């Protein structure tokens, strides 16, 4: 009967996933029903990332009337690899002085413990990167990425094209025990027989090592465009998107016959395509192009995120837009409050209007419904070809008039004008809504397509998020919708660490002294 070997990993410090400060440790169990010749038993801790990208035949370029054949592009990066021998012990192994003579192990059960050092901060593959290596990160900002798509085999069992293409990028960490038998070598069996057992685990670095740093060169940032050949937007299985951004340096574009290209798969409703010709970057012409990047500005130390478009008002001359103002909306941790006062997320939302104040004060403007979506953009890169995947999670959808608060959410009696009187603003008090003020982000630690919610960027995989705030309005009986996009937003699956100030010691009056009579 063949030997049975298994791995038992000690649980992580937080009880959920391994992190940067953990030391991987555990026990290797070996059961033998008969004597066996064993040369050595090793435990290997390793991680790797793998991506596969495709080129759509529809967008292939022709050379002299000949269509270039399509091909798959694969990349494989070794993130880390450490090996530890658990049998035989070091003193015995050193005494062998290179001898390959095996050990005869009697039947029975054997346990071998192992422990590795803390996880490295940077991936091992950096030493193999050259000046021509195509990657999303540089040597200075590269960090060991979190586990991603470790259940990729399950995606192939689902008849869903989006999940199939989503599984083309993965980051997997594992502990592998390798038992090398001591069978004598011969000309027809030149290698020792190996028995392997693998145990995968989830690794997520500390938040400081997940932060996506902005690109060093703003010229490398390319706006994403909507390909309307299949419609402006598409909703499938409650997953949709409105905006995305693909950032790839121009030098990283695959060049074929003097023309370079980066292409997303056609199976997604939005395609990102860029051409490089004569050293210049230009967008691929499409039937209708809409920019999705919103400009932000600072007001009183807060970033202002305006709505993507202005809404015309019934008088034909006035218009209004929505502004979200925040100091810290670019990072959101799990269990952060989204609308509560002081959360610095959506607690300061304003309606900004332009027009005649007398006309504006007569209008009936009421917020009716609110929907907040989390938009995911995952980009895989391989051999200079990048494919984008897009999906959406609905965080909340609520009828704002279902529960009445003490004060109206929008009171036009509190409208005020700016310093030059050209615009007027009024606060939309979403923070006072009895449901919204209790809403926290990702309280249940949701797994989207098998992965926790976190942003990260590594050599060939980039996962970013943005927030989309949709509000439906009733304006003099006419329904209109506003949209605000916050892009990008750094998402963490960890709970924010609240540093509480140490309480001052209680005041104790000093003792009183009396002079003793001499």
Swiss-Prot record:
Present with 736 molecules/cell in log phase SD medium. CDD domains: ART10-like (cd22952). Ubiquitinated by RSP5. Gene3D superfamilies: 2.60.40.640. It comes from the Eukaryota. One of its GO terms (biological process) is ubiquitin-dependent endocytosis. This is Arrestin-related trafficking adapter 10. There is a cross-link at residue 118 (Glycyl lysine isopeptide (Lys-Gly) (interchain with G-Cter in ubiquitin)). Keywords: Cytoplasm, Endocytosis, Isopeptide bond, Ubl conjugation. The keyword Cell division does not apply. Belongs to the ART10 family. It comes from Saccharomyces cerevisiae (strain ATCC 204508 / S288c) (Baker's yeast). It is found in: Cytoplasm. May regulate endocytosis by recruiting RSP5 ubiquitin ligase activity to specific plasma membrane proteins in response to extracellular stimuli. Interacts with RSP5. The gene is ART10.
């Amino acid at each position: 009967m063949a030997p049975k070997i298994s791995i038992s990993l000690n649980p992580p410090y937080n009880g959920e996933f391994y992190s940067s400060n953990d030391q991987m440790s555990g026990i290797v169990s070996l059961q033998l029903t008969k004597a066996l010749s064993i040369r050595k038993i090793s435990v290997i801790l390793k991680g790797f990332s793998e991506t596969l990208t495709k080129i759509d035949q529809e967008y292939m370029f022709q050379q002299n009337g000949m269509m270039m054949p399509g091909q798959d592009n694969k990349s494989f990066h070794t993130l880390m690899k450490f090996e530890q021998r658990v049998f035989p012990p070091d003193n015995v192994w050193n005494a062998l002085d290179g001898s390959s003579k095996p050990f005869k192990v009697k039947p029975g059960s054997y346990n071998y413990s192992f422990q590795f050092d803390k996880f490295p901060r940077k991936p091992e593959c950096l030493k193999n990167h050259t000046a021509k290596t195509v990657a999303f990160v540089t040597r200075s900002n590269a960090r060991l990425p979190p586990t991603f798509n470790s259940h990729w085999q399950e995606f192939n069992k689902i008849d869903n094209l989006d999940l199939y293409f989503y599984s083309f990028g993965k980051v997997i960490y594992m502990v592998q025990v390798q038992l090398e038998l001591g069978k004598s070598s011969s000309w027809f069996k030149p290698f020792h027989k190996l028995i392997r057992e693998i145990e995968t685990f989830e690794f997520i670095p500390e938040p400081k090592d997940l932060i996506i740093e902005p690109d060093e060169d703003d010229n490398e940032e390319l706006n994403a465009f909507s390909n309307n050949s299949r419609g402006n937007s598409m909703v499938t299985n409650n997953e949709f998107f409105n905006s995305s951004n693909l950032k790839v340096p121009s030098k990283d574009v695959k060049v074929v016959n003097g023309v370079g290209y980066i292409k997303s798969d056609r199976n997604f409703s939005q395609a990102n395509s860029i051409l490089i010709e004569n050293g210049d970057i230009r967008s691929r012409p499409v039937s209708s192009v809409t920019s999705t990047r919103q400009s932000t500005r600072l007001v009183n130390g807060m970033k202002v995120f305006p709505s993507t478009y202005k809404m015309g008002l019934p008088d034909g001359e006035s218009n209004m837009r929505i502004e979200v103002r925040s100091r810290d909306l670019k990072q959101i941790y799990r269990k952060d409050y989204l609308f509560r006062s002081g959360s610095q997320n959506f607690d300061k939302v304003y309606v900004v209007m332009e027009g005649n104040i007398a006309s504006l004060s007569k209008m009936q403007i009421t917020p009716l419904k609110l929907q907040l979506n989390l938009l995911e953009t995952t980009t895989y890169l391989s051999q200079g070809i990048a494919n984008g995947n897009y999906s959406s999670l609905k965080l909340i959808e609520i009828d704002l008039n279902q529960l009445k608060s003490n004060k109206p959410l929008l009171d036009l009696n509190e409208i005020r004008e700016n310093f030059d009187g050209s615009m007027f603003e009024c606060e939309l008090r979403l923070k006072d809504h009895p449901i919204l003020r209790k809403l926290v982000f990702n309280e249940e630690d949701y797994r989207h397509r098998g992965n926790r919610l976190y942003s990260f960027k590594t050599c060939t995989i980039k996962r970013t998020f943005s927030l989309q705030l949709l509000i439906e309005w009733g304006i003099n009986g006419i329904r209109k919708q506003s949209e605000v996009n916050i892009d990008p937003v750094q998402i963490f699956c960890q709970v924010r660490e609240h540093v509480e100030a140490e309480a001052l010691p209680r005041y104790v009056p000093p003792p009183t002294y009396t002079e003793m009579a001499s």
